[in-house]
Amino acid sequence: GILDVSRQQLKGASNGWVVASQRTANGSTILLADPHTELQSGAYYEYRIQAGDLKSAGFSLGPLLWQANNNHLSWAMTTGNPDMWDCYAVEVDPENPTRYRFDDQWQEMVEFEETFGVRGGETVTEVLEYTRHNGVLSPVVARRGNTAYVVSTSQMHDAGLLDNEIWRMNQAKTVFDLRDAMTGLGMFPQNIVAGDSAGNIWYLRAGKTPIRPPGYDWTRTVPGNDSATEWLGYYTMDEMVQMLNPPQDFLQNNNVAPDRMLTDRNIDAAAYASVLFNDTPGRITTRGLRALELLSDADRLTLADAHDIAFDETWITAKYWVAALQYALVQFPGWLEEQSAETV
């Protein structure tokens, strides 16, 4: 039958790369934004808009002009993030489980009653409980005995900040404008790869990241009954993992660690707070390896070349399998003749 391309899903992966104008045939910066989403997604939509000073085209996330080109500047996003969330274990009052202890006082949880529609079923009403850890509403996600487990995220209360930031990003004309637009750190955790018409390219590992007090293992649940584990503030834009105009004149982040965006490791993980780098140094995907191979060899890149790179189907590790199988055929020359569908 006819292939329903709207139902083809590629989950958990995105590609983003940019080649500066110095390495392209026509002197234009070329950027790929490939979010690996469905053509008819419930969240992402391809769009083109012109309204007054706003001229933008790309992929929207709901109403937000998410991955965009505005004739002066383009950017792509791929999954990758600083550490922006923490889990707290909080003692609750056994006589009143909606109260929790904080700095030797009982505090009342904030409660909201919400009703959720269920497709094909009856609505469900739940009471949602929150504490006020780190100055933000922090949801109770589990209970065990007299302990409530609470998740605190720096993104809570920042929805309006994100809207304003996306608007300013779409108004930017250079990567320097883009950086200024993002200094409020309202962006969701993402790898941002950007390029402008002047040939500048830039990478940012975006995400509003808390500064934690020392002395705790923040990779696990921490005590949440006093202010000793309250966040001390947030890292600034200047402290975030980023790179501007590398000498290779290209950048790629196909879901790789920040130090594997180039063949030479221009980013040193040790130079950043671990919660900002927040990845295994040297980790790379097969998509990242292939992008490095193709982009490193690209010179006087054309749009046709970029198209070929975007749709390249080479599986970069296949050559090792071919070599191993060729070796096996030499070592065991009669093996194939002895096999059947039942024995392979």
Predicted regions mapped to residue ranges:
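Mature extracellular/secreted ectodomains of secretory-pathway proteins
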Residues: T343-V344
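Mature extracytoplasmic enzyme cores
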Residues: G1-Q339
